[in-house]
Amino acid sequence: MRRILIAAWICILAAVVASSWMYRRSTRFDFIIGQAAARHGVDFHLVKALIYEESWFRPGIRGAAGEVGLMQITRAAAADYTKRTGFPGYRPEQLLDPALNVEIGCWYLKDSLTRYRDSPHPELFALLRYNAGETPTRNWLRLALESPPPAGAEPETHFLSLVDYPKTRTYAGRIL
């Protein structure tokens, strides 16, 4: 009986430590996220959910396709940001700076939300663009406009069913 109690206490302690560690990890960038989200007029919670999905709040992470940082910024997105905002040139390693990374990510997300503001589900199509790029997202939007959700169907679920990239479909579904 004593061993069972000790094991139970160890499990409880491990759960408390893991929870506090995850809480700390997920809140330590809230100030940066809040500033950038407000500056670009995007929802704070949407940005946090995107960061969780992209990097699990790990600022130094690098993706297989060369994307980096909390919001997994690509060089192409960073180049577009510098060109369209007049931001001075940057060195690729600067994209690992959480403040710059979140700034560019929020700018890109806002650009996507603006681009798809007239779509049937702007947040969904913005996330699809963020993950898969412009061309596939335009194709999915065309399909969505050609086949509206059936009566009684959840629009988000219907539009996600049109996405033929399984990872992108899961990505957007998890964020929303």
Which stretches of residues belong to each language-model region?
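Hydrophobic alpha-helical membrane-insertion segments, chiefly the h-region
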Residues: 12-21
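Short amphipathic alpha-helical surface micro-motifs
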Residues: 51-55, 153-156
